[in-house]
């Protein structure tokens, strides 16, 4: 039996629901027939890995086996499952511990030099997950409360004093880049790229004001690490997801970041303010679709003040299109290495994603296009 991508995606979504502690859609049941081949299990595992959810899907499989809803004879082959478990231990759980250690060490450096370090996205999101170690640990995004220049100078001097070959890369928009241990660190001097769209400078002023709040923090291995306020993190997560979705793609892991954030911090968010701000900058359409996916596809409870509105058939079709694009982007070609083919590739991708840009932004696409061209001219390495 040959299964379609949509069927495998639906099985994947069911396993994600179970893996995060939710039940299946009411009235449905998990179906894996005895004809589910090792190759199909491999394809399912590859989808989970692309989405950053290998650990969550494995958790879902464990729920099914434990509850007797997936007979062991229909489970994947023992050796295949052992390899999957090994991957989760190595790439998720062990790496998460290294991630925490790196964050603590970096915060310790800044604390000892008189700087305050706030983590954005990554670790701040992981703290909201039921199993933080089952969220993939990638880059470390930090905000130093406007002290990026002085902090980079101090860090650069420290690198030299240590005889380290590490350098601070200034070729990117809105943040510098360096490596701490084996983790790439993005040290933000702006929360978003103010050159990419005309409205971004105005939105950045809102982020900067919210970024002054230093009342939220945790201790990581004895070092103080600051966290964004609920309003800052909520706005930042939506804006970051929008930027990646409209330009190229996002993963279901990013959807879960938003869902777990709302689940844990929803009572702290000033929802009327956030919705007004999203509407002002044209982000509310994507926000509505994202919330619908979280509630209807992943089983999260809706926020009372954000009850899902009665939706048209057009909205439901749009939600399905967004969901399928998250799972398998409509434009999924590989980026060429050479400059001219890469520039042509970016233009074709921009045109293919026109429907996403209309969903996510108010501004004219061509206004954004020329802003983007100027953005790349300012930092040619971003092409």
List the model feature ranges, each with a label.
Residues 2-138, 144-383:
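Conserved NTP-donor binding/palm subdomain of two-metal-ion nucleotidyltransferases/polymerases, i.e.
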């Amino acid at each position: 039996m040959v299964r379609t991508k949509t069927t495998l995606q639906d099985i994947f979504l069911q396993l994600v629901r179970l893996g995060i502690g939710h039940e299946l859609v009411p009235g449905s049941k998990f179906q894996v027939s005895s004809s589910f081949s090792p190759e199909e299990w491999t394809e399912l595992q590859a989808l989970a890995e692309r989405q950053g959810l290998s650990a969550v899907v494995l958790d879902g499989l464990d729920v099914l086996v434990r509850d007797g809803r997936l007979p062991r004879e229909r489970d994947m082959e023992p050796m295949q499952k052992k390899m999957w478990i090994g991957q989760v231990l190595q790439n998720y759980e062990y790496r998460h511990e290294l991630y925490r250690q790196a964050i603590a060490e970096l915060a310790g450096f800044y604390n000892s030099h008189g700087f305050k370090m706030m983590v954005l996205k990554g670790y701040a999101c992981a703290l909201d997950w039921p199993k933080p170690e089952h969220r993939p640990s990638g880059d470390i995004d930090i905000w130093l409360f406007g002290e990026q220049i002085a902090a980079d100078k101090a860090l650069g001097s420290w690198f030299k004093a240590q005889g380290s070959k590490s350098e601070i890369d200034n070729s990117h928009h809105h943040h510098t880049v360096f490596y701490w241990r084996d983790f790439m660190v993005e040290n933000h001097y702006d929360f978003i790229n103010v050159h990419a769209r005309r409205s971004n400078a105005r939105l950045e002023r809102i982020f900067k004001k919210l970024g002054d709040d230093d009342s939220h923090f945790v201790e990581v291995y004895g070092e103080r690490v600051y966290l964004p306020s609920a309003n800052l993190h909520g706005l930042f997560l939506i804006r970051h997801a929008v930027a990646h979705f409209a330009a190229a793609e996002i993963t279901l892991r990013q959807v879960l970041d938003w869902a777990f954030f709302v689940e844990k911090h929803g009572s702290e968010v000033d929802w009327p303010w956030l919705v007004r701000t999203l509407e002002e900058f044209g982000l509310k359409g994507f926000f509505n679709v994202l919330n619908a996916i979280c509630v209807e596809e992943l089983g999260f409870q809706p926020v009372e003040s954000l009850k899902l509105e009665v939706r048209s058939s057009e909205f439901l079709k749009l939600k399905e299109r967004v969901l399928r694009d998250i799972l398998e982007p409509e434009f999924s070609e590989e980026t060429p290495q050479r400059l001219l083919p890469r520039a042509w590739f970016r233009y074709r991708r921009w045109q293919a994603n026109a429907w996403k840009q209309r969903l996510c932004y108010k501004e004219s696409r061509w206004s954004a296009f020329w802003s983007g061209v100027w953005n790349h001219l300012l930092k040619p390495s971003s092409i």
